[in-house]
UniProtKB/Swiss-Prot annotation:
The keyword DNA damage applies. One of its GO terms (cellular component) is nucleoplasm. Substrate-recognition component of the CSA complex, a DCX (DDB1-CUL4-X-box) E3 ubiquitin-protein ligase complex, involved in transcription-coupled nucleotide excision repair (TC-NER), a process during which RNA polymerase II-blocking lesions are rapidly removed from the transcribed strand of active genes. Following recruitment to lesion-stalled RNA polymerase II (Pol II), the CSA complex mediates ubiquitination of Pol II subunit POLR2A/RPB1 at 'Lys-1268', a critical TC-NER checkpoint, governing RNA Pol II stability and initiating DNA damage excision by TFIIH recruitment. Residues 371-396 are annotated as: Disordered. The keyword Transmembrane helix does not apply. Pathway: Protein modification; protein ubiquitination. This is DNA excision repair protein ERCC-8.
Length: 396
């Protein structure tokens, strides 16, 4: 650490390298914070979480009870032990509350004055944060599993919506209507995600075992249907390609948008090149997944080696994205975890579970001390630690 600081001060090292190394160290030290609670409001399981990208201060949660809660994550009391309080909530007595389970909540990417929610009640709602009133409501014929707004687009205000039907619907917030329908899947759409790199690139995952990449400006169908065998097993038409051997119920782009992670009920996670659709063949081992709906997982941002956090039963498994190595299992929930979200400013993780709790995972403030009867040599250290701190640190 001192070597990095000295090199940065003298201009020998790029400041970004120090930041990435420290971010990596903090992610590797994530543990359940016993001094921080998140106020318990939900009477049912937590299905979805989202932290606004403007300040990284406010978090939305949506539950199986139809309730939406807005939390302030900042420690305004400056005390070591504190509770993240609910600023407001859309409870059962609210006139516009969702009638059934809320499956997805998302902040408007450019402003905290608006957020969206979708539910099993077949609606997508657009909310005014200040008044907690609906600004618009989109009604669908089928149950809504997932929706997503582009985190980078300044050219369109399209919300991609996945429902129990096989069609992906694009809702335009400007016009207040469904402007596009993407056809190609054969069963329900369990997850949708816009690329964080390109305005018009959308990924969709379905119960038909397929993942498709779309350029929504094109009228001629999808760009690519991902093939787990990279075209080697069969030279059949692209429509026969499958990404998993079960339902695909989770999607997540890496922060740079160059790769796409998918999870399926075949207990596998796969990493894809998002530009050509190639399966990178990274082996993550068994990733337990028996969810019958969308699984919300997340990736780190700004680390030397990026990490992916995946709900795994009542735990959260942490893997190195590009090597597939399992770093740790975060244990603290009593029931199945359905969602997690990463706070990149402070390298924190928040998770929601069917035990009705939201837990905060924060970097430990101390170095782990080995047992007296153990000797830890450099060769025994986790390779991710070696990536985080270079030899120049030891010399400093």
């Amino acid at each position: 650490m001192l070597g990095f600081l000295s090199a940065r001060q003298t201009g020998l090292e790029d400041p970004l390298r120090l930041r990435r190394a420290e971010s990596t160290r903090r992610v590797l030290g994530l543990e359940l914070n016993k001094d921080r609670d998140v106020e318990r409001i939900h009477g049912g399981g937590i299905n979805t979480l989202d932290i606004e990208p403007v300040e990284g201060r406010y978090m939305l949660s949506g539950g199986s009870d139809g309730v939406i809660v807005l939390y302030d994550l900042e420690n305004s009391s400056r005390q070591s032990y504190y509770t993240c309080k609910a600023v407001c909530s859309i409870g059962r007595d609210h006139p516009d509350v969702h009638r059934y389970s809320v499956e997805t909540v998302q902040w408007y990417p450019h402003d905290t004055g608006m957020f969206t929610s979708s539910s099993f009640d077949k609606t997508l709602k657009v909310w005014d944060t200040n008044t907690l009133q609906t600004a618009d409501v989109f009604n669908f014929e089928e149950t809504v599993y997932s929706h997503h707004m582009s985190p980078v687009s300044t050219k369109h205000c399209l919300v991609a919506v996945g429902t129990r039907g096989p069609k992906v619907q694009l809702c335009d917030l400007k016009s207040g209507s469904c402007s596009h329908i993407l056809q190609g899947h054969r069963q329900e759409i369990l997850a949708v995600s816009w690329s964080p790199r390109y305005d018009y690139i959308l990924a969709t995952a379905s119960a038909d075992s397929r993942v498709k990449l779309w350029d929504v400006r094109r009228a001629s169908g999808c760009l690519i249907t991902l093939d787990q065998h990279n075209g080697k097993k069969s030279q059949a038409v692209e429509s026969a390609n499958t990404a998993h051997n079960g339902k695909v119920n989770g999607l997540c782009f890496t922060s740079d948008g160059l790769h796409l992670l998918t999870v399926g009920t075949d207990n596998r996670m796969r990493l894809w090149n998002s530009s050509n659709g190639e399966n990178t063949l990274v082996n993550y081992g068994k990733v337990c997944n028996n969810s019958k709906k969308g699984l919300k997982f997340t990736v780190s941002c700004g680390c030397s080696s990026e990490f992916v956090f995946v709900p795994y039963g009542s735990t959260i498994a942490v893997y190195t994205v590009y090597s597939g190595e399992q770093i740790t299992m975060l244990k603290g929930h009593y029931k199945t975890v359905d969602c997690c979200v990463f706070q990149s400013n402070f390298q924190e993780l928040y998770s929601g579970s069917r035990d009705c709790n939201i837990l905060a995972w924060v970097p430990s403030l101390y170095e782990p001390v080995p047992d007296d009867d153990e000797t830890t040599t450099k060769s025994q250290l986790n390779p991710a630690f070696e990536d985080a701190w270079s030899s120049s640190d030891e010399e400093g």
